[in-house]
A protein has these predicted regions:
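Bacterial N-terminal signal peptides that target proteins for export
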Residues: 1-8
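Cleavable N-terminal signal peptides
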Residues: 9-10, 20
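Structured catalytic-domain cores with a bias toward divalent-metal coordination
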Residues: 23-327
Length: 330
């Protein structure tokens, strides 16, 4: 009897094993490679080819496949100050955002996670990732979904517990379509092809323009975006009161159902998150520097108002040479 029971048990185990194995999803294979930022062929790194800028920073490329999409992500950590924010740059064509993130991680510490559009290493950058097995290109900031869990796990691998502050950085096209707004005036200076402006109000966005509109908020495309649950007040959004007290341009994002963005993902999980945006001003030095400077100014405000991480105020890079003071005649 005992022998027969043992045989039946073994047969049952053989039948169940394949089914059980099918329920276990293997961990995604990730290729992690240390990289030298001074020899990288991508435009983001080429523009920052200064050895002093990268001292104390550790740079790795992380490659993996999640569902139908192949991803290439760069992780930049401040080795001296690893406990700062998680700086997220999802769109490869938003060049000022990448530069601001590198300067911010040098000053405030933490980790930069920047998505490289995997097919454009030898060509113009794109905000979308077209390296897919099938279907349409994927927006890196619309991929925080239940059916792509490995993507979120990889992007937020350094989040920690308690979670560190997440600061997402973006640049976007100028202006907006006034026809899409319920409150904005139809003026030539505000019309454009963008989707982000503190003059835009809709079911999704509730604007709070800066009262003084001093730089960098003289540009209505330079804003902080704070998400809040659709059945609650905008004041419940992370750090919303403090940012309003700082007289920032703020767009309150009303979230009823997730759109796959990191702002929505963070809201539903109670993570500290702020999104900073400014107008894309191209890749020429003057325009790139202007957009970068506006992002850095807003970063300073967020770090002063919303973060417990100690750090020096951001300084413009490269530093301007100091001129000797004029001596008074004796």
């Amino acid at each position: 009897m005992t022998r027969a029971l043992a045989i039946l048990t073994a047969l049952a185990a053989l039948l169940i094993a394949p089914f059980a194995a099918a329920q276990i999803s293997p961990a995604p294979q990730k290729i992690v490679t240390p990289v030298d930022p001074l020899t990288m062929g991508t435009d983001n790194f080429t523009r920052l080819a200064d050895p002093d800028l990268w001292k104390g920073l550790s740079i790795h490329r992380i490659e993996f496949r999640d569902a139908r999409t192949f991803w290439r992500v760069y992780r930049v950590m401040n080795l001296r100050k690893p406990n700062g924010p998680l700086w997220f740059v999802p769109h490869d064509n938003e060049n000022a955002a990448f530069q601001a993130a590198i300067l911010a991680v040098r000053s405030y510490g933490g980790v930069v996670v920047a998505v490289e559009e995997a097919r454009s290493l030898a060509g113009p950058d794109s905000r979308m990732n077209g390296d897919v097995a099938f279907g349409r290109p994927v927006d890196p900031n619309r991929n925080f979904r239940d059916d792509t869990p490995d993507y979120a796990r990889t992007i937020l691998a350094d989040l920690g517990s308690p979670a560190r502050l997440i600061i997402a950085l973006h640049t976007n096209q100028a202006g907006f379509d006034a026809a899409e707004s319920e409150c904005a005036p139809d003026q030539p200076e505000t019309s454009g092809s963008g989707e982000i402006s503190v003059l835009l109000c809709s079911d999704l966005y509730l604007p709070r323009p800066s009262i003084r509109a001093a730089w960098p908020y003289d540009d209505t495309d330079s804003v902080a975006i704070v998400a809040f649950a659709g059945d609650r007040s905008p004041a419940t959004g992370f750090c919303s009161r403090a940012l309003a007290d700082a007289d920032m341009n703020i767009m309150f994002e009303r979230v009823v159902k997730t759109d796959g963005s990191l702002s929505n993902y963070a809201l539903y999980r109670g993570l500290p998150y702020v999104n900073l945006e400014t107008q894309d001003r191209g890749v020429e030095p003057v325009g790139l520097g202007d957009a970068r400077a506006r992002l850095l100014a807003m970063i300073d405000v967020v770090m002063a108002r919303c973060s417990t991480v100690d750090g020096l105020a951001l300084r413009t890079w490269p530093p301007r040479p100091l001129r000797p003071a004029k001596r008074r005649p004796r």
